[in-house]
């Protein structure tokens, strides 16, 4: 049991930080989205930092509605950027480099959302068993299936 506890001990020494640059080709979900897309119209990239290394990455957008495609995400985040009316964070890609980082970065994103006054975090997830299990295990509720994506909701 002690080995398991020691294995995840590093998670207590992490920091949720905004990133200005990442290697987009590392993204296992949406590698086709370039850095400009990920950082324009109030879209942001966050990392889970431990000992000067980024162990988890999450790309988010701010919207008022729930997108079902990347195109809708783009349009909705542009509208919210200009209208300044977003109330939801859309996590459209999450990945980790170290065991436990995926869960921890979602926990940190929920804290961030709460401190910034957002109502919820909604995902724009691929239709894969891995994505489904990740979100259900972390406490999200399935909002719906779309032709190419699925949405899960985390209450803040």
Question: What annotation goes with each model-predicted range?
Answer:
Residues 1-40, 45-50, 54:
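Short amphipathic alpha-helix that is part of the acyltransferase structural core
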Residues 56-58, 94:
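Conserved GNAT-family N-acetyltransferase fold
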Residues 59-90:
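Conserved acyl-donor/pantetheine-binding loop and adjacent beta-alpha core of acyl/acetyltransferases
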Residues 89-101:
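A short, internal acetyl-CoA/4′-phosphopantetheine-binding micro-motif in the GNAT/acyltransferase core
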Residues 96, 122-133, 148:
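Conserved beta-strand-loop-alpha-helix junction that forms the acyl-donor binding cleft
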Residues 98-114:
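Conserved acetyl-CoA-binding loop-helix of GNAT-fold acetyltransferases
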Residues 136, 141-154:
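Conserved catalytic-core motifs of GNAT/GCN5-like acyltransferases
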């Amino acid at each position: 049991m002690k080995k398991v506890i020691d294995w995840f001990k590093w998670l207590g020494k992490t920091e949720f930080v905004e990133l200005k640059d990442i290697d987009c080709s590392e993204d296992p979900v949406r590698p086709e989205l370039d850095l400009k897309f990920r950082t324009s119209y109030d879209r942001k990239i966050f990392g889970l930092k431990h000992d000067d290394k980024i162990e988890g990455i999450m790309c988010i957008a701010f919207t008022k509605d729930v997108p079902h495609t990347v195109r809708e995400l783009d349009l909705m985040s542009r509208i919210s950027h200009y209208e300044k009316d977003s109330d939801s964070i859309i996590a459209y890609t999450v990945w980790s480099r170290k065991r436990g980082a995926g869960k921890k970065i979602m926990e940190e994103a929920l804290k961030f959302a709460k401190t910034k006054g957002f109502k919820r975090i909604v995902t724009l997830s691929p239709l894969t068993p891995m994505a489904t299990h990740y979100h259900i295990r972390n406490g999200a509720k399935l909002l719906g299936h779309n032709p190419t994506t699925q949405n899960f909701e985390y209450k803040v």
